[in-house]
Amino acid sequence: MTALHDLPGTRLLALFARRELSPGEYYEHLLAHIQRWEPHLNALYRFDPQRVRDQAAAATERWRKGQPKGPLDGLPVTIKELIATAGEPIPLGSAATALQPAPCDAPPAARLREAGAIVLAKTTVPDFGMLSSGLSSFHGVTRNPWNLANNTGGSSSGAAAAAAAGYGPLHLGTDIGGSVRLPAGWCGLVGFKPSLGRIPIDPYYTGRCAGPMTRCMDDCLLLMRYLAQPDARDATSLPPEVLDWSAEPLSVRGLRVGLQLDPGCGLQPDAEILAAIEAAARLFEEHGAQLRIVEPLMDRSLLDGLNDFWRARLWSELLLLDETRRARVLPYVHAWAEGGARVSGVDAVRGFNQTFEMRRRAARLFGEIDLLLTPTNQVEAFPADRASPLNDPQRPFEHIVFTVPWNMGEQPALSINCGFTAAGMPIGLQVVAPRFADTWLLRIGKTYEGWRGPIHGWPRPPAD
C-alpha cells in the first residue's frame, strides 16, 4: 500500500473531494514523517507545524462543506527561500544578510496561495543562490535523501531534498543556470525550467525562472496550471494566454530529436551516465523519432565569460555590505566572488554579452531539430560537504554546461529521472524544446515517463 506521504497531489485532491481523506488527517501523517527525516536532511526554513495544523484544520472544514477555497485547497507546497513570502525574512542563504520581513508574496507564492495551497515551509538554499550545492552559511548543510553523505545540488537544494524525501508532493524552486534541474537530476525528480516569463517572478533577472520540482509529471503539470498566470511586477513575463496543461502523452513519430553527449567544455560525463542517456534516447528512436547527434553548444569562452560576469555582479553586491558582514559569507562563495574585483568593466560586459551568444546558438540549434536530449548532470551526486563537484572556487561552473544555455536562450527545459548509477544514485535526462513550447514539452515528459515506468523505492528516513 502506498504511504500517504508518497501520494501525488492529483490523488490527494481526489481523496479530499471524496472525503476519503481530510487535509487534517494527511498533515498529521506528513508532519510525523517530516520529523523523522528533517534532523538528517536539513531541508526546511520557517517550518511551523502548529501553523500548518491550523491551516489544515480550516481546509478540512471547507472540504467537509464542499466549499474548497481553491483548486489546491489543503495541498502542501514548499517554496524556495529566495522567493518572497509575506512577513518572512529572506536571508538569501547567507549569514551576511540582514533579516527583514518581506512586504508581500512574490508572484509564484501569491498564485499558489490564491489556488488554496498551504505553504508547508520555505526550503534551504546556498549563499545568494550561487552554488549548485546544499552548503549555506545561514542554513548549514542540506543532504541528499538517497545517500546522506551526498549533495543535493542546488541552488534549489532544500526543495530537492524535501521532494525526494516525501515532504508532500509539490515544491517550487528557481533556476538561473540549472538550479531546478541540477538538483532534480541528482535527487531523482521532475524539475522544470519554463520559457523565460512563463511564470512571473520578482525580482526578475537575465535567465532567472521559477519552476516546479515534483516526483511525477502529473504534479508538475498541476503546479504549472496555477503558476503560469500573469503578474505585472515581472516586466519580462509573457502575455496572458490560455494554455492546455493536460497530462496526455503524445506521439514522437517523425520528430527530429537531437542527442548531445559532448558538453564542449567543463566536466566530461561519466560513462554510466552516458549509457543511461543513450538508453533513454533509444526509446525515442524506437517510438519513431529521428535521432541525430548534435555538436556541443558551449565552449570555454562562453563559460569563462559567464563566470566573469556573474562573479563581478555578486562582488558589486557584496561591496554594499560592511566588512563584518562580508566575512560571514560562505568562504567558497566569498573567494569566488572576490575574483570579481579583478574583472575589468570591459571583461564584465564581454562576459554578459556571452549570454547573447548562447541565445543565438540555441536559436540556431532549434532551427535544425524539434527536441534535444542531454544529460542533466555530467557526474553522480558529489559529497555533501563540497560547494561544487570540483570544490574549486576558480572553476565553479564546470557542471552547468548542459543546463545554462537554455536559461539564456529562454527555451523550456525539463529534467526527468532516467535511471540510477551502480551506487544507487539518480541520473537525470534533460529534455529541451523550442521557446514557448512549454505545454508540448511537458507532454513529451509525460510520454517518456510512461515508457520508463514509475520510480519505486523512494528513500526512507534512517530510523526506518
Summary of predicted features, one role per range:
Residues 1-54, 286-288, 341, 457-464:
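An N-terminal boundary/leader segment
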Residues 361-363, 393-417:
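Small-aliphatic-rich amphipathic alpha-helix that forms the alpha element of a beta-alpha
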